[in-house]
């Protein structure tokens, strides 16, 4: 790499100006977060003299406030970010210079720039022109035009260093995890997962890349990243790799190291597998949500039956000691597929889910049932004022409500439907045609069997004191 600049002699202070390559290259390691943050770690293969060193770097997407060196012998004492030169800045830099201008018919004329605002130019005949005489052509001189953003960084070194590491937090690259589960008829599924990287601001050429899954607070507004120009980048390193991401725990996050060196471009998504195909047992459930979550309130309802959704849930078993259970699963999207009679896979559901630690089952709602339907009607509602038990004074409100839920199954096989009831505070089910099962202090369920091509009816009464 060509170096330009000067070194101080006898002062113990070294000053070096150097320009690095445009894309984030092989000396770079990136940690990409799903919220758009990127931790950029860059090894600077430049000698640092003891004392002050000034570098001119190309650090794409730099937020100067976040720049630091993890090297204990090197401190960042200042960082100035200079954008690529626009036309107005180039004209201001040319004040006092003679610039060539291209006019309408393709001929050129030279004029001396006296002022930009207001425009003032001295023409070859000595006259002054108060309008720009054409499209300017600027000489490719250092200091006049910057073709890309540039960071001028001052580093203070306590000893001579042959290279140093710089770290900063950038923006504009996100990743998401998408999983595919092909459901078998025997309650077993094959699961695959991949991460897709999307860059809106950074080009990356042959870098080590980690994906970070976890919830991390953001305490400051991000600086707008300086955009890099898009360009073609080879991705052979990722394409030829047959390895999968390696996971480790760092703090309260999980970090996934992608295999090999990764290249990606602005606006060109890159997808890489997270883990080998795994097999997992699953359970399908039909769930009717409780009256309060479905209606949004607890009170008198219209006497006519209300159609309520029958939700379809899948629980993937992830016991320790299994290929799918031993790995933490970053939150993302689960796509569910099932084969038709011709063996073609059809999309039968899709759901978002949060980060799932190793050993914890993964439960997703894929949609609503087609052939299993439900209607709920409130058959009775009574509200009374009940005296409080002494020594408490006054009274409290007691609401008693009765419901009838009719379940219809148009399938050729019997199903079991979970009918849920959710309330807060002091409540109980005082009567029901099917025994309730307490799931928590706020939720109970009824497991109602429904015959093939038939119906089943559930009745129950809820009592709530408030």
Q: What function would you assign to each model-found segment?
A:
Residues 15-19, 23-466:
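Long, intrinsically disordered, low-complexity accessory segments associated with secretion
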Residues 1-3:
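Positively charged n-region of N-terminal signal peptides that target proteins for export
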Residues 5-14:
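Short polybasic linear motifs
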């Amino acid at each position: 790499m060509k170096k330009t600049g000067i070194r101080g002699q006898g002062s113990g202070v070294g000053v070096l100006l150097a320009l690095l390559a445009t894309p984030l290259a092989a000396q770079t390691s990136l940690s990409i977060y799903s919220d758009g943050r990127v931790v950029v770690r860059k090894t600077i293969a430049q000698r640092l003299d003891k004392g002050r060193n000034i570098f001119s770097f190309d650090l794409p997407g730099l937020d100067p406030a976040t720049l630091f060196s993890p090297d204990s012998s090197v401190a960042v004492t200042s960082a100035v970010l200079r954008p690529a030169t626009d036309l107005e800045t180039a004209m201001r830099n040319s004040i006092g210079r003679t610039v060539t201008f291209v006019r309408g018919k393709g001929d050129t004329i030279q004029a001396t720039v006296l002022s930009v605002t207001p425009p003032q130019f001295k023409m070859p005949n000595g006259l002054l022109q108060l309008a720009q005489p054409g499209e300017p052509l600027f000489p490719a001189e250092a200091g006049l035009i910057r073709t890309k953003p540039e960071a001028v960084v001052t580093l203070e070194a306590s000893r001579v260093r042959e290279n140093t590491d710089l770290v900063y937090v950038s923006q504009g690259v996100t990743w998401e995890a998408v999983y595919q589960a092909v459901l078998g008829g025997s309650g077993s599924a094959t699961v695959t997962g991949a991460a897709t990287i999307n860059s809106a601001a950074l080009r990356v050429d042959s870098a080590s890349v980690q994906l970070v899954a976890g919830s991390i607070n953001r305490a400051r507004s991000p600086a707008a990243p300086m955009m890099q120009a898009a360009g073609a980048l080879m991705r052979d390193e990722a394409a030829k790799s047959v390895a999968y991401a390696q996971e480790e725990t760092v703090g309260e996050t999980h970090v996934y190291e992608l295999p090999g060196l990764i290249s990606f471009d602005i606006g060109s998504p890159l997808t890489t597998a997270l883990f080998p195909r795994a097999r997992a047992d699953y359970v399908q459930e039909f769930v009717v949500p409780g009256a309060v979550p479905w209606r949004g309130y607890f009170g008198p309802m219209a006497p006519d039956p209300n159609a309520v959704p029958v939700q379809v849930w899948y629980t993937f078993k992830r016991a320790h000691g299994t290929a799918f259970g031993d790995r933490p699963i970053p939150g993302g999207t689960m796509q569910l597929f099932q084969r038709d009679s011709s063996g073609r896979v059809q999309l039968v559901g899709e759901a978002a889910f949060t980060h799932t630690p190793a050993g914890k089952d993964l439960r997703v709602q894929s949609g609503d049932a087609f052939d299993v339907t439900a209607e709920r009607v409130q058959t009775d509602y009574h509200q009374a004022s009940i005296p409080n038990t002494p020594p408490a004074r006054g009274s409290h409100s007691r609401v008693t409500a009765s419901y009838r839920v009719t379940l219809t199954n148009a399938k050729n096989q019997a199903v079991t439907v979970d009918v849920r009831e959710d309330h807060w505070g002091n409540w109980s089910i005082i009567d029901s045609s099917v025994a309730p099962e307490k799931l928590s202090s706020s939720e109970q369920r009824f497991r109602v069997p429904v015959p093939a091509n038939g119906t089943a009816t559930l009745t129950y009464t809820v009592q709530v004191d408030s």
